[in-house]
């Protein structure tokens, strides 16, 4: 069993995090979850959910550990804590900006900082449009520092029939990037 950190910041698209966590759990991985206060508000607004745990079965919760964003004393804040990858999904531009300047003032930002300094996979799924120059410069800076910028772009070539198809394709692509098998992962094949 491998350990993954999933951070949820205050950007729209929290369903992507929920789907990713479910897929990681289905693959029997341990998932450490950190949710920002704005992320909790978005969770309620977009999914109508008061409690993060209510989104998962009792069996799934055995693999999920939720951490307070203020728990800077968490083992996750140390480079000695083994983590396969950190994924911040969705990732607000506030979080992008903070990470890009090394501001590690809460557990979510510290875990991202640790991923960069330890040269571990850090995947950021920024949810903002349009992007202005400062957004782009911050994302470029993070990319140059080793982060993978994974914007939630629709994959029209799979001919999605619903928004859920688009969500699943993105989550499947993240899982494929992490080399985690999933039924959500699709591979392009030329229809000719």
Swiss-Prot record:
This is Flavin prenyltransferase UbiX. GO terms for molecular function: flavin prenyltransferase activity. It comes from the Bacteria. It catalyses: dimethylallyl phosphate + FMNH2 = prenylated FMNH2 + phosphate. Dimethylallyl phosphate binds at residues 157, 173. FMN binds at residues 10-12, 36, 92-95, 127. It comes from Chlamydia pneumoniae (Chlamydophila pneumoniae). Belongs to the UbiX/PAD1 family. Keywords: Flavoprotein, FMN, Prenyltransferase, Transferase. HAMAP family: ubiX_pad (MF_01984). NCBIfam families: PRK06029.1 (NF004685), ubiX_pad (TIGR00421). Its EC number is 2.5.1.129. It holds the Pfam family Flavoprotein. The keyword Transferase applies. Flavin prenyltransferase that catalyzes the synthesis of the prenylated FMN cofactor (prenyl-FMN) for 4-hydroxy-3-polyprenylbenzoic acid decarboxylase UbiD. The prenyltransferase is metal-independent and links a dimethylallyl moiety from dimethylallyl monophosphate (DMAP) to the flavin N5 and C6 atoms of FMN. The gene is ubiX.
């Amino acid at each position: 069993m491998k350990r993954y950190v999933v951070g949820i910041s205050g950007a729209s698209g929290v369903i992507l995090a929920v789907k990713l966590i479910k897929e990681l759990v289905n693959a029997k991985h341990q998932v450490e979850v950190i949710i920002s206060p704005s992320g909790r508000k978005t969770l309620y607004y977009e999914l109508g959910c008061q409690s993060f745990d209510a989104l998962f079965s009792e069996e799934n919760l055995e693999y999920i550990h939720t951490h307070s964003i203020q728990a800077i004393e968490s083992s996750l804040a140390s480079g000695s804590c083994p983590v396969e990858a950190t994924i911040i999904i969705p990732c607000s531009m506030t979080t992008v900006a903070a990470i890009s300047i090394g501001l590690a003032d809460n557990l979510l930002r510290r875990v991202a900082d640790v991923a960069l300094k330890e040269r571990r996979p850090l995947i950021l799924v920024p949810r903002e449009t349009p992007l202005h120059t400062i957004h782009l410069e911050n994302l470029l800076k993070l990319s140059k520092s080793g982060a993978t910028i994974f914007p939630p772009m629709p994959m029209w070539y799979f001919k999605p029939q619903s928004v859920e198809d688009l969500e699943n394709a993105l989550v499947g692509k993240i899982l494929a990037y992490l080399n985690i098998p999933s039924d959500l992962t699709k591979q392009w094949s030329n229809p000719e």
